[in-house]
From Swiss-Prot:
This is Alcohol dehydrogenase 1. It comes from Ceratitis capitata. NAD(+) binds at residues 9-33. The gene is ADH1. Substrate binds at S137. It comes from the Eukaryota. Homodimer. One of its GO terms (molecular function) is alcohol dehydrogenase (NAD+) activity. GO terms for cellular component: cytoplasm. The active site is at Y150 (proton acceptor). Belongs to the short-chain dehydrogenases/reductases (SDR) family. Its EC number is 1.1.1.1.
Amino acid sequence: MSLAGKNVVFVGGLGFIAYEACKYLMNNDLASLFVFDVLDKPEAIKALQEINPKTKVYYTKFDITNKESIKQSLADVISKVQHIDALINGAGILTDPNVELTMNINLIGLINTTLEALPLMDKNKHGRGGVIVNIASVLGLEPCPPAAVYCASKFGVVGFSRSLGDPFYYEHTGVAVVTFCPGLTDTPLKNNIGSKYTFDYSKEIGEKLNSSKTQKPEVCGAHLAQAIELMDNGAIYISNQGTLTKVKPSVYWEPTY
């Protein structure tokens, strides 16, 4: 999908990987970029706008744990530009001791945002199709013993996204659903993991993860923008150590008819 002239909504767009992706997107002649975030960083929004004055950048204070905030924020986008062409769900935290907050932000909020946006993008309703990219993690594909709650939330994102990425939904709506799984990236999410393990004693098995090789957020952000452009329904992409790879998950069970 060419991004030129498109309207993009980026949830959690001021995070490290997300912000790098936003900078990349601003060089693609978007019609508009809506940045939804709980953080308020006017200088960051200003810097985005300066990349390409022709693309209108909007900032919305956004609480992904509040369904009314989700509904009103997306309705505001429609009132301003009529159509959403791409939605990126990028909000996320790593704080295993707070199970409810982890699930509410990483999974439930993402689900609610997707379910609210999809009918607005549906080509058979008032939309014109497009793409939804849900940011999971490589830890949504493989277990992570020291961060079991975070891992569970990201496994949920993968399962939810793969389900909505079924051809049945794409043929009906014209909206591709893509899963993007960053590997370990040099961001505060990874750097602060030491105090956020599932249990205090999980640190014993978490130190290797905390000291493993990472990639730069600029590289991961560029990969994310590429995944948006590819608009490959049902695809799962891993961004790891500078390489973007499409992966095919194993099939362990299929219904018998």
